[in-house]
Amino acid sequence: MLQTLYDYFWWERLWLPVNLTWADLEDRDGRVYAKASDLYITLPLALLFLIVRYFFELYVATPLAALLNIKEKTRLRAPPNATLEHFYLTSGKQPKQVEVELLSRQSGLSGRQVERWFRRRRNQDRPSLLKKFREASWRFTFYLIAFIAGMAVIVDKPWFYDMKKVWEGYPIQSTIPSQYWYYMIELSFYWSLLFSIASDVKRKDFKEQIIHHVATIILISFSWFANYIRAGTLIMALHDSSDYLLESAKMFNYAGWKNTCNNIFIVFAIVFIITRLVILPFWILHCTLVYPLELYPAFFGYYFFNSMMGVLQLLHIFWAYLILRMAHKFITGKLVEDERSDREETESSEGEEAAAGGGAKSRPLANGHPILNNNHRKND
């Protein structure tokens, strides 16, 4: 049974054009071709990424945060209460007024005390500014290096300037070491993002991020073993071109450098719109949808690849909407936080401000900077 499923999954008619077989992609005459087995290395590399990330955040990002005066914020903790904790974990983090009254009777606390407990308990689960900075620093470092490396891989290739050459000789296109490592490192990184997503800072578009990571992993994997490598390198470099800008904007935001953050965000928004909503659909997608049909009839792999590209494009439209809405509020002076941010709540009952900070007024954010409290995506 398993052998039958295995044979069907790797049936040439699913992944390759008509009249071609996997035998056509076997190494010969010094020419090396992509193989599905090459991807096995990405899982241990993903674990290595997690280890490198841990030490990077500990020995690079944390000292950098200290230089920028980004510190852990002391938070008032919710006192132990089994009744309220059980409701928090099983029924919801924001009880309705009727539920507050019921919990008040069950716990022996006043309604104000119940509301205060849930407010503090929610704040306990929210990531600290330092955690956000360390995560943004790690992603900024990777995306910047990946973008530079990706451009080095493709800038001297003829298909970078003439996309019809992406399909010249397809699928009998050999690979070179730079393409191999570019693919393995990118795929390993996205595996590491998927592995760490449960412990990373959670955004309001958490589900969209999971969809993005899964679709990206599927696309990179398929484009490798089906030898869509030329198109794949273009797509990966295109995506990396804006991601490092976003992460750097977040880093400056967490450091309280509002003007720098805002200026970088504007550049990021422009680059994102141009690359994701113009170049990707009208050049890259046109290249993968139209040009292959000039060489061979459509097959399952053709539809599968472009369907995954369609999923990514829908996510890009969704994130572009959030970016444009933020940009509009920024221009009109109404932007107070990122569209995806999970804003920390302030204490509002008498005496709590004094207990928390010597009677200071409630502040919506640590370090007092309201722009882009949290990060945009993608994804991202």
UniProtKB/Swiss-Prot annotation:
Concerning PROSITE patterns, the annotation shows:
TLC (PS50922)
Keyword Electron transport found: no
Q: Which domain of life is it from?
A: Eukaryota
Query: Mind telling me how this protein is modified after translation?
Result: Acetylated. Deacetylation by SIRT3 increases enzyme activity and promotes mitochondrial ceramide accumulation.
- Catalytic activity entry: a very long-chain fatty acyl-CoA + a sphingoid base = an N-(very-long-chain fatty acyl)-sphingoid base + CoA + H(+); docosanoyl-CoA + sphinganine = N-docosanoylsphinganine + CoA + H(+); tetracosanoyl-CoA + sphinganine = N-tetracosanoylsphinganine + CoA + H(+); hexacosanoyl-CoA + sphinganine = N-hexacosanoylsphinganine + CoA + H(+)
Annotated TM spans:
41-61, 140-160, 181-201, 209-229, 264-284, 304-324
User: What pathway does the annotation place this protein in?
Assistant: Lipid metabolism; sphingolipid metabolism
Stretches of the chain found on the membrane's Lumenal side? 1-40
Q: Which GO terms describe its cellular component?
A: endoplasmic reticulum; endoplasmic reticulum membrane; membrane
Entry comment describing in which tissues the protein is expressed? Expressed in kidney, liver, brain, heart, placenta and lung.
**Where Phosphothreonine occurs along the chain?**
346
Q: What is its EC number?
A: 2.3.1.24, 2.3.1.297
What is a GO molecular function of this protein? sphingosine N-acyltransferase activity
- Biased composition of type Acidic residues is found at 344-353
Could you list which ranges are Cytoplasmic topological domains? 325-380
Q: Which SUPFAM superfamilies match?
A: Homeodomain-like
Outcome of swapping residue 325 to A: Abolished inhibition by sphingosine-1-phosphate
* Subunit architecture: Interacts with ATP6V0C, ASGR1, ASGR2 and SLC22A1/OCT1. Interacts with ELOV1, HSD17B12 and TECR. Interacts with NDUFS2. Interacts with PAQR4; the interaction regulates the stability and activity of CERS2 and is inhibited in presence of ceramides.
Q: What does this protein do?
A: Ceramide synthase that catalyzes the transfer of the acyl chain from acyl-CoA to a sphingoid base, with high selectivity toward very-long-chain fatty acyl-CoA (chain length C22-C27). N-acylates sphinganine and sphingosine bases to form dihydroceramides and ceramides in de novo synthesis and salvage pathways, respectively. Plays a non-redundant role in the synthesis of ceramides with very-long-chain fatty acids in kidney, liver and brain. Regulates the abundance of myelin-specific sphingolipids galactosylceramide and sulfatide that affects myelin sheath architecture and motor neuron functions.
Q: What protein am I looking at?
A: Ceramide synthase 2
